[in-house]
Amino acid sequence: MKQLVERFLSYVSIDTQSNPSAPQCPSTEKQLNLANQLVIELKELKLADVSVDKNGYVMARLPSNVDYDVPAIGFVAHMDTAPDASGENVKPQIIKDYQGETITLGTSGEELNPTQFPDLKNLIGHDLITTDGTTLLGADNKAGIAEILTAIAILQANPEIPHGDICIGFTPDEEIGRGANLFDVEKFNAKWAYTIDGGPVGELEYENFNATSADVICHGVNVHPGTAKGKMINSMNIAAQFQLMMPTDETPEGTEGYEGFYHLKSMESGVAKTELGYIVRDFSREGMAERKAFMQQKVDELNEKLEKGRVELILTDSYFNMREMVEPHPHVIELAKQAMTACDVQPDIKPIRGGTDGARLSFMGLPCPNIFTGGYNFHGIHEFITINGMKQAVDVIVKIAELNALNNK
């Protein structure tokens, strides 16, 4: 467990925040700092086929230790952290034997309160790693990286545990939706894989949102305010009218489970032009089609009211629900469930209210459900992880590798 924690703390000390505004891959050069460190560690573990390409994708392989054919499987995690909060100068706190108290996050004035974060009530006796309240932690997804490498080290140190080829992949830019864009599935050469990018212990996910970006562009006319009567058209007022036409109960803060939403995420405004940036989510293709049609209907209604085509809608699909690509391969899910049960972990199968690299990879021919890391409150200063949960993730990875070999003997 010490080795696991040391790896994790080493990784979170490296700022790898991605940048959605940068077109290149990786979107930030600093992601390569972690990629290069991981290459060194993979070579120290004497793994085969260790590589990092110009875009920051890291790959390696632990060769099979059995003399019969076993399907190669993969484990994938991402190196970048979310743009939502700073990932620079992360100062983790380790809370030993948590007993239900409110945790003070450094000197920031922020805290983890069990009333606000009730998951803490289920973690009595656990060792926690938190932030100091000024940055995110980076458990999403550096915990996954640490867990994968620790599991590989355990397999190497215990050759009596049978396993086939284990393929390892670490990706850039997952948090900005591009993690799988340049992933070389053929080079990776696994039959299926698992992203280690989930939350609390037991999470096993093979459904995710269908995702679309919706840009609503409102055009106005700017005239000096002193002579504006009958001439000025304020695009911000048009944008406000459009937002008021959207359902107030179908937002992230008002939905859960399999419910989709519209989320106004950004706005760039001026009198002459205002752009509203929405993300639209739904678990079914039919539901997504209805949401797109609804937005277009509201744009058309507003344009008719304004008597001029002053509102545009640009829809861009981001990713799709991997369920349709994973369900034809039920053994992929059954193996993960079998491994969790063998490790005294209760599988908690639920939809991902978001996306992972695995969603894109599944549509690229690599079925790739998602497994827990043991972390909570990703993307913000209240992010934390349990060391106990990290250890359980390692155990499950090792057991998946072992059972895959035993099941194919």
From Swiss-Prot:
Chief localisation class: cytoplasm
GO cellular component: cytosol
Subcellular location: Cytoplasm
Gene3D superfamilies from the UniProt entry: 3.30.70.360, Zn peptidases
E.C. designation(s): 3.4.11.4
GO biological process: peptide catabolic process; proteolysis
HAMAP family: Aminopeptidase_M20
Protein's UniProt name: Peptidase T
Annotated organism of origin: Aliivibrio salmonicida (strain LFI1238) (Vibrio salmonicida (strain LFI1238))
